[in-house]
Amino acid sequence: MIIPDLHTIMPIIITGVGALVVLLCGPLLLSGTTSSIAAVTAAAAGLWAIFTAPSAVPAVAGLTFTPLAQFLIPLFCAAALLTLLLSHGYNENRAIKGEEYPATVLFALFALCVLPCASNLLILFLAIESVSFAFYILVTMDLQRAESGEAGLKYLLMGAVAAAFTAFGFALIFAGSGTLELAGAVPHADNRAIVAAGWGVVIMGMAFKLSLVPAHLWTPDVYQGAPAPVAAFLSTSSKVAAASLLLMLLTFSPPMPELRIPLVLLSLLSMVVGNLAALRQQNIKRMLAYSSIAHMGYLTLALLTGTREGYAALLLYGAIYTAMNLAAFGAIASLSLEKERDQIADYSGLGFSAPLRGGVLALAMLALAGLPPTGGFIGKFFIFYSAIKGGETALAIVGIISAAVSSFFYLKVVASLYMHRSSSPAPRAAAAADAVALCCAAAFILLLGVFPAPLLRLVDAALQ
């Protein structure tokens, strides 16, 4: 390795150094400065990744800036940046003070940047678990709410189980293949059984991370108890990271028919159970939690195809889903400055009294339902198209039906925003940071709905 090689992993270095600076120097800085430094750090890391050419040469042992990393790192940085912007006004009205919050967001981003660059199983495991550790802390940050601590404890306990599954699975893959390198951890005639078993255990571990049924029970409580901006970051970046881990392993592995049945069951149950459970929810965060279970079922369907089209659909939908959930939870956070608005009924008439935030929330609901001309429609179209083309027609039909059913509970939120009046006073005006973040997420959703070609080209390049 020579020093110039390090420029390809500068996003990792930038986020790591930025997190340490915010944490160590925070007590010496003015209030609010740490959040600004963290936001600039996330933006700088994302821009560096965009303008750095991928390389097949490892920058350091175990870390290579691949085309996939060039796609995912800016996505993670954008999610972290919008989360920090949305957190500014929300945290001022909560007991979430000091430099710990922005520093922990940057530590999570650091691990997220490491993950797509990893070229061996050990670094991959450390990266995905470091992401989880950061979120255990972030979920419990709202000290004024007992639900926040309860959510963090539940997430920690379930995360420990997921970590055990993942570690055991990687150990089996290592035992069978004799190497930690991703390129060498493939099944052969003499080691197929043990490597396939390792794969099965890793999939179960990632099922916890992705909230796939039956490993989904922690999700509604954690989303409900977490601060809304944290729920936005958790429901997007951690999910895309877990799906990307499976994608990275699959791209190095030949098809393994024995894994098809577990993936089919995980996808089928998640799409059906997630959407049916969401129908009964009156709490908007729990509704979005169950809907995220269904959306992860769609991602698993794309992964199941084992085709380039399926993997492209996974990355495309991951990017669009990030924007949709950031918009949804961001609007919830901005509308909950004075008090938590947990129930769908709490949003009655807010489409008129808070038109920007109500409009963004309505747009996010329409996009999550997959209605045109939003990015959600484009994402679902490519998911189901790739599934049908990959021979999973029956599962695609189930997915289409479940997506149609989901329109009911998404439109229920839109109806509450615009078809009901409320006697409650209008919410406080949106902070400038909230407005910028929400407008960026909404613009991304709309632009991808009418002009998805640029993102499709980026996805194609990421799979080279």
From Swiss-Prot:
Compartments in which it is found: Cell inner membrane
Residue ranges of the TM segments: 9-29, 39-57, 65-85, 98-118, 121-141, 156-176, 193-213, 230-250, 259-279, 287-307, 312-332, 358-378, 394-414, 436-456
Topology in membrane: Multi-pass membrane protein
InterPro entries for the chain: NADH-Q_OxRdtase_suN/2, ND/Mrp_TM
Catalytic activity field: a quinone + NADH + 5 H(+)(in) = a quinol + NAD(+) + 4 H(+)(out)
GO biological process per UniProt: ATP synthesis coupled electron transport
Stored Pfam families: Proton_antipo_M
GO MF term list: NADH dehydrogenase (ubiquinone) activity; NADH:ubiquinone reductase (non-electrogenic) activity; quinone binding
A GO cellular component annotation in the UniProt record: plasma membrane
EC annotation from Swiss-Prot or TrEMBL: 7.1.1.-
Keywords: Cell inner membrane, Cell membrane, Membrane, NAD, Quinone, Translocase, Transmembrane, Transmembrane helix, Transport, Ubiquinone
Translocase as UniProt keyword: yes
Function: NDH-1 shuttles electrons from NADH, via FMN and iron-sulfur (Fe-S) centers, to quinones in the respiratory chain. The immediate electron acceptor for the enzyme in this species is believed to be ubiquinone. Couples the redox reaction to proton translocation (for every two electrons transferred, four hydrogen ions are translocated across the cytoplasmic membrane), and thus conserves the redox energy in a proton gradient.
HAMAP family: NDH1_NuoN_1 (MF_00445)
Family: Belongs to the complex I subunit 2 family.
Subunit structure: NDH-1 is composed of 14 different subunits. Subunits NuoA, H, J, K, L, M, N constitute the membrane sector of the complex.
Name by which UniProt lists this protein: NADH-quinone oxidoreductase subunit N
Organism: Citrifermentans bemidjiense (strain ATCC BAA-1014 / DSM 16622 / JCM 12645 / Bem) (Geobacter bemidjiensis)
Taxonomic placement: Bacteria, Pseudomonadati, Thermodesulfobacteriota, Desulfuromonadia, Geobacterales
Gene name tied to this protein: nuoN
